[in-house]
From Swiss-Prot:
InterPro entries: Enolase-like_C_sf (IPR036849), Enolase-like_N (IPR029017), Enolase_C-like (IPR029065), Mandelate_racemase_C (IPR013342), OSB_synthase_MenC1 (IPR010196), OSBS_N (IPR041338). The lineage of its organism: Bacteria, Pseudomonadati, Pseudomonadota, Gammaproteobacteria, Enterobacterales. Its EC number is 4.2.1.113. CDD domains: OSBS. Pfam families: MenC_N (PF21508), MR_MLE_C (PF13378). The active site is at residues 134, 236. SMART domains: MR_MLE. NCBIfam families: menC_gam_Gplu, PRK05105.1. Its cofactor is a divalent metal cation. This is o-succinylbenzoate synthase. GO terms for biological process: menaquinone biosynthetic process. The keyword Magnesium applies.
Length: 321
C-alpha cells in the first residue's frame, strides 16, 4: 500500500537576509512524505527566489501531479523542475534505503567579517579550519581588507569566498589588491567572481586566487573540463535536480581532480539534514557548505543536531492532500 502527503510551510527569516538585491522575509517551501508498506521517506521542495528558474507555484503543481500518479501505483518520471525532482528523489531514496543515514554535520561557518566571532566558531570545529565569507555585497576594497584581516589573524584558516558574479574585472582586481599575496593560497576558492566566465578565468590567472564554478554549472553549454585556476565545483542540489544528477556532477568533478562541495540553497532544517547525509555519502573528504539554518527563526520536522532554534513538527505544516 502506498500513501502520500504534501505539506506547505513558511518560516520567518532573520531581518538581514538579502538575495540578489531583494530582502527575503520568509522561506517558503513544500515537503513530500511518501509511505509504502512500513517504510517512509521525506523530501523538501523549496525553490530559492532569485536563483531557481521555477516559482514555488510551478514546483507545487509538478509535485502534486507526480504524487497523485505515484500513490495509485504508477511509476511516474521525475518532474523536469529541479527543486521538485530533487525533493521527490530524496523521498524515494529514503523510502528504498539508498540515502545513507550517516551525515556530515560539520559546516563551514558563514562569517560576517568579525575575527573574534570566527575564532569562537572555529575553536569548536574539529580538523580543518574552513570558513565562508560572502563578498560583493559591499565595496570590493572593504571585502579585500576583511579577507586579509581574517587570514592574518588566524594562520591555519582556509577561506571559501562567494561573490555571486557581483564584480566587474576592475572591482575584482581592487579586491585582490588588498589581499596579501602570501595569504592567497589559503583562499580555498572564490566562487564566480565576475559576471562572465572568461573574466573570472582571467582574474584567477592574474591574481593566483583559485576560483570555483557555481551558477555556471546550471547554464546551457557548461562543460566539465579541467581549467587552470579552477579548483572546485559548488553543487546546490535544490537548483540542480534529482539525486542522480547530483551524483553525476560530483563524479564528473572528482574525475577532473576538482573538489565538489555540496551547498545549501537556504533549505529548512529537514532539507539541510538531508544535504548533510548526501555530503557524507558523495563528498566524504569535503566540508559541505550548509551553515544557513541560523538565517531562519525555526526548525521543521527534523532537527539539526545541537542547534538551539525552536522546533516545529508536522502539526505546524499545511497538508495539501
Amino acid at each position: 500500500m502506498r500513501g502520500a502527503q504534501v505539506y506547505r510551510w513558511q518560516i520567518p527569516m532573520d531581518a538581514g537576509v538579502v538575495l540578489r538585491d531583494r530582502r527575503l522575509k520568509t522561506r517558503d517551501g513544500l515537503f513530500v512524505h511518501l509511505q509504502q508498506d512500513d517504510r517512509q521517506g521525506w523530501g523538501e521542495i523549496s525553490p530559492l527566489p532569485g536563483f531557481s528558474l521555477e516559482s514555488l507555484a510551478e514546483a507545487e503543481a509538478a509535485l502534486l501531479a507526480w504524487v497523485n500518479a505515484w500513490r495509485i501505483g504508477e511509476s511516474p518520471a521525475l518532474p523536469a523542475i529541479p527543486s521538485a525532482a530533487f525533493g521527490i528523489s530524496c523521498a524515494l531514496a529514503e523510502l528504498d534505503g539508498t540515502l545513507p543515514e550517516a551525515a556530515d554535520y560539520r559546516a563551514a561557518p558563514l562569517c560576517s567579517g568579525d575575527p573574534d566571532e570566527l575564532f569562537e566558531s572555529l575553536a569548536a570545529m574539529p580538523g580543518e579550519k574552513i570558513a565562508k565569507v560572502k563578498v560583493g555585497l559591499y565595496e570590493a576594497v572593504r571585502d579585500g581588507m576583511v579577507v586579509n584581516l581574517l587570514l592574518e589573524a588566524i594562520p591555519d584558516l582556509r577561506l571559501r569566498l562567494d561573490a555571486n558574479r557581483a564584480w566587474t574585472p576592475l572591482k575584482a582586481q581592487q579586491f585582490a589588491k588588498y589581499v596579501n599575496p602570501d595569504y592567497r593560497d589559503r583562499i580555498a576558492f572564490l566562487e564566480e567572481p565576475c559576471k562572465s566566465r572568461d573574466d573570472s578565468r582571467a582574474f584567477a590567472q592574474e591574481t593566483g586566487i583559485a576560483i570555483a564554478w557555481d551558477e555556471s554549472l546550471r547554464e546551457a553549454g557548461f562543460e566539465f573540463v579541467a581549467e587552470p585556476g579552477v579548483t572546485a565545483l559548488v553543487i546546490k542540489p535544490t537548483l540542480t535536480g534529482s539525486l542522480d544528477k547530483v551524483r553525476e556532477q560530483v563524479a564528473a568533478a572528482h574525475a577532473l581532480g576538482l573538489t565538489a562541495v555540496i551547498s545549501s540553497s537556504i533549505e529548512s532544517s529537514l532539507g539541510l539534514t538531508q544535504l548533510a547525509r548526501i555530503a557524507a555519502w558523495l563528498t566524504p573528504q569535503t566540508i559541505p557548505g550548509l551553515d544557513t539554518l541560523n538565517l531562519m527563526q525555526s526548525q521543521l520536522v527534523r532537527r539539526w543536531p545541537g542547534n538551539p532554534l525552536p522546533y516545529l513538527d508536522i502539526e505546524a505544516l499545511e497538508p495539501l492532500l
